[in-house]
């Protein structure tokens, strides 16, 4: 369910821009911009409780999936722009290129095994589209008819290299129906914006993991890997 208009999304992202320009955001971040209409249309199909997996460029997705904008701004303001997540809303992100499709496929498998009516939505860039991890995840989802939809957010740029630069052509691979693609032009540079910010002040703003996750469970050091066991099975870790 899309919760914001195009204008509102831009205004929320502008708050991050203004904070950076005011020298109060000395961290790496990746701004969204130029794909508001496409994302609003997609999130109108996403239900509360559906699983959403996103890349390092994730602010719009977080807003549209119901994460409080103040929480997003707080996380971004403390250097966690690339790692936004909300376990209760089943929202996860990762900065590892091509690192989330296989996780999304695994969650979709667990949902199918549990008979859940929830669905997985996995957003990747056209750089991650080039990875073997994505190919394997797509093949597994398609072959097993899993409730997972991959969305390629294609701005024709992987960091600063176009498809032509990477492959010698701009040919688009033809994926099965579990993969959709939308094309857009990114409004901002790959990371940050083209203005100076004093990175030396980062320690004044950054919170510790203990401050963010006060109830984070501490696990004992594993001395013998053969004796190690997980408290939860994979299916138990995925809620219905």
What positions do the PLM features span?
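Glycine-rich ThDP/TPP pyrophosphate-binding loop and its adjacent helix/strand module
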Residues: 90-94, 98-240
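Cofactor-binding active-site loop characterized by glycine-rich and histidine/acidic residues
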Residues: 17, 24-144, 168
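Short, hydrophobic/amphipathic alpha-helical patches that form generic packing surfaces
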Residues: 12-14, 41, 240
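Conserved internal helical-beta-strand scaffold that buttresses enzyme catalytic cores
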Residues: 1-26, 35, 73-88, 196-236
């Amino acid at each position: 369910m899309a919760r914001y208009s195009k204008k509102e999304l831009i205004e929320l992202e502008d708050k991050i821009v203004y904070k950076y320009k005011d020298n109060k955001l000395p961290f790496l971040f990746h701004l969204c911009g130029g794909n508001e209409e496409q994302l609003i249309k997609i999130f109108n199909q996403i239900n509360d409780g559906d699983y959403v997996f996103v890349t390092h460029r994730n602010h719009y997705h977080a807003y549209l999936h119901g994460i409080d904008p103040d929480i997003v701004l707080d996380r971004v303001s403390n250097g966690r722009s690339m790692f936004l997540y909300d376990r209760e809303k089943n929202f996860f992100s990762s900065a590892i290129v091509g690192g989330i499709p296989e996780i999304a496929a695994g969650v979709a498998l667990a949902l199918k095994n549990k008979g859940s009516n929830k669905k997985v939505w996995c957003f990747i860039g056209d750089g991650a589209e080039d990875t073997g991890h994505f190919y394997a995840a797509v093949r597994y989802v398609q072959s097993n008819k899993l409730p997972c939809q991959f969305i390629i957010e294609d701005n024709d740029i992987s960091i600063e290299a176009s498809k032509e630069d990477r492959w010698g052509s701009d040919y688009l691979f033809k994926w099965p129906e579990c993969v959709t693609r939308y094309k857009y032009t990114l409004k901002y540079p790959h990371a940050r914006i083209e203005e100076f910010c004093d990175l030396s002040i980062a320690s004044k703003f950054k919170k510790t993991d203990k401050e963010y996750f006060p109830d984070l469970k501490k696990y004992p050091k594993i001395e013998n890997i053969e004796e190690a066991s997980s408290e939860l099975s994979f299916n138990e870790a995925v809620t219905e």
